[in-house]
Design a protein with these regions (language model features):
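Active-site beta-strand/loop architecture of penicillin-binding DD-peptidases
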Residues: 1-29, 36, 45-131
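Short, highly charged C-terminal tails/helix-capping segments
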Residues: 133-143
Length: 143
């Protein structure tokens, strides 16, 4: 199901000799979303990447879920936008989440066109680095 995990950037503090000085712990609040709801949301967000506006976030051999966003900044009519894409992979067992936010992109300004390719490039490098195996399945079955 869904667990709330505190975002964090480190798990240990090391001294100059590389020995652990402190191990950080982060609270996990369990059961905030049912397993069924979590699976449904993963499926919907995976479809955004496989068939929708997030297609530029697809990574060959990996299942990726995500959401694009495009917003106009004030004042309205200024022609200024914020484009973004948040993605997670592998979609069936998320290990990595990343977001790209582009403030006032030039030319094309849609999140799926501007920000999703950034996450794709990141995942093309980081997923193999993490030792995650490619899959033949590109999309999970509907629940």
């Amino acid at each position: 199901g869904g667990n709330r995990i505190t975002p964090h950037f480190g798990i240990e503090a090391l001294n100059r000799d590389g020995e652990v000085e402190e191990t950080f712990s982060y609270p996990v609040q369990e059961g905030i979303v049912s397993e069924e709801t979590s699976a449904t949301m993963r499926y919907i967000l995976e479809m955004v990447v496989s068939e929708g506006s997030g297609r530029n976030g697809q990574v060959q051999g990996f299942r990726v879920g995500g959401k694009t966003a495009t917003s106009q900044t004030l004042p309205r009519g200024s022609g200024r936008y914020i484009s973004s894409f948040i993605g997670f992979a592998p979609a069936d067992d998320p290990q990595v989440i990343a977001i790209a936010i582009i403030n006032n992109p030039q030319g094309v300004y849609y999140g799926g066109q501007v920000a999703a390719p950034i996450i794709r490039q990141l995942y093309e490098n980081i997923l193999p680095y993490l030792g995650l195996e490619k899959t033949e399945d590109t999309v999970v079955e509907n629940h």
